[in-house]
Swiss-Prot record:
NCBIfam families: PRK04964.1
Family to which this protein belongs: Belongs to the UPF0253 family.
This protein's name: UPF0253 protein VFMJ11_0680
Domain of life: Bacteria
Xref: InterPro entries: UPF0253
Amino acid sequence: MKVYDCCDKVRELYSLIGSGDQGYIPQAITCAVKTLNDIAADESLPKEARERAAFAAANLLISDFEDK
């Protein structure tokens, strides 16, 4: 997926991180998994959104890419 395929909010933050105006997190996969886990665990959110977040987190965890 390319940044231009993402929503406006993602593109905005991408630009801010790239310009140095927003902090960069070197362990981005860990950050993503933690965020997806928080979404999946939040029972106030719709079930479909929680299931999608859980699926994405599980796929990241099982992938061979690791933060170093």
